[in-house]
């Protein structure tokens, strides 16, 4: 998909990207999983080469932040959660050249969608491509801050479950949720640190106007304030995991203790039975016509009753 936006009176407006020649008026060219024809069109109309999929996946700093004859290049992670609530980081390739911003990505991202919605009613302050780039980074940081707050809320709810729960399945679900939250927190941290590196590169290499230089420093301060909060999430997750495992061990030890007591209680009768067996002369049960099937039924009930009781107690 190819989207193009022009800047009129410091306000972004969408261009009809299907018309030939409209890209020349664009200040922002946004490509989402572009096909070969869209890549060729950008190359033909604007003379701009776009990053390949392999280049997007490269994690070396020299391949993610650099400047060449095709412009200033920044590859940065953006956080997302898909329809199944699976979290991930998608790389977006930013290129600034000749007063135009190019963005290339493989999927739709919440930060971009939110920024496009905001531009319908908001105007840019200085109206340049660096402000566009920094606005997108600001929107990303806001999204990451919201994600950290959501993790905090989920951890508070899990804390009550772990501290007050007495059912084994509650602990199992809590541990599974904790693992998911830890994964989300790690991806948020990776995105924060990657954005920090990208902005530091931008401040060093680009000749930012004074307004955008201050804007970049403000975003960097926001990142520095979020990183300690993100770190505390890992400490909270680790504490709750250890607490849950401790309660599970206590519960297992209690169950094993009950089994041990039951075994000890039945050990003396078993010892007597094994010593004397069924070797007495006077045994009225030997004359019962239903003695054998009755004994079989008694054995089945004797084995089934403890099983059902232990199952009801969630010991099995």
From Swiss-Prot:
Record site feature (Essential for ion permeation), residues: 253
Catalytic activity line of the entry: Mg(2+)(in) = Mg(2+)(out)
Family matches, as InterPro entries: CorA_cytoplasmic_dom, CorA_MIT, CorA_TM1_TM2, Mg/Co-transport_prot_CorA, MgTranspt_CorA/ZnTranspt_ZntB
General function of this protein: Mediates influx of magnesium ions. Alternates between open and closed states. Activated by low cytoplasmic Mg(2+) levels. Inactive when cytoplasmic Mg(2+) levels are high.
Residues annotated as transmembrane: 258-278, 290-310
Protein's name according to its UniProt entry: Magnesium transport protein CorA
Protein species of origin: Sodalis glossinidius (strain morsitans)
GO MF annotations in UniProt: cobalt ion transmembrane transporter activity; magnesium ion transmembrane transporter activity; nickel cation transmembrane transporter activity
Gene (UniProt): corA
Membrane topology: Multi-pass membrane protein
């Amino acid at each position: 998909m190819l989207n193009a936006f022009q800047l009129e009176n410091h306000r972004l407006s969408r261009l009809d990207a299907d018309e030939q020649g409209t890209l020349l008026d664009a200040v922002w060219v946004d490509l989402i999983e572009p096909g070969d024809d869209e890549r060729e069109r950008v190359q033909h109309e604007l003379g701009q080469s776009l990053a390949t999929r392999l280049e997007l996946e490269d994690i070396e700093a020299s391949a993610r932040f650099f400047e060449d004859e095709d412009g200033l290049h920044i590859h940065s992670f953006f956080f997302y959660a898909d329809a199944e609530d699976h979290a991930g980081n998608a790389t977006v390739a930013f290129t600034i050249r000749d007063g135009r911003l190019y963005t290339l990505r493989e999927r739709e991202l919440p930060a971009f969608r939110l920024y496009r919605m905001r531009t319908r009613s908001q105007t840019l302050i200085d109206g340049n491509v660096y402000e566009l780039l920094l606005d997108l980074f600001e929107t990303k940081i806001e999204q990451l801050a919201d994600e950290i707050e959501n993790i905090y809320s989920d951890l508070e709810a899990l804390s009550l479950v772990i501290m007050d729960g007495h059912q084994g399945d509650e602990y199992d679900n809590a541990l599974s949720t904790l693992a998911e939250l830890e994964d989300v927190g790690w991806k948020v941290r990776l995105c924060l640190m990657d954005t920090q590196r990208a902005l530091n590169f931008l401040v060093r290499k680009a000749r930012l106007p004074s307004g955008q230089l201050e804007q970049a420093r403000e975003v960097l301060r926001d990142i520095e304030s979020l990183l300690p909060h993100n770190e505390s999430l890992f400490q909270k997750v680790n504490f709750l995991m250890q607490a849950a495992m401790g309660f599970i061990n206590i519960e297992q030890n209690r169950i094993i203790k009950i089994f041990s007591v039951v075994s000890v209680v039945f050990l003396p009768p078993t010892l007597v039975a094994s010593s004397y067996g069924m070797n007495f002369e006077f045994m009225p049960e030997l004359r019962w016509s239903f003695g054998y099937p009755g004994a079989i039924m008694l054995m089945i009930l004797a084995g089934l009753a403890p099983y059902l009781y232990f199952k009801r107690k969630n010991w099995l």
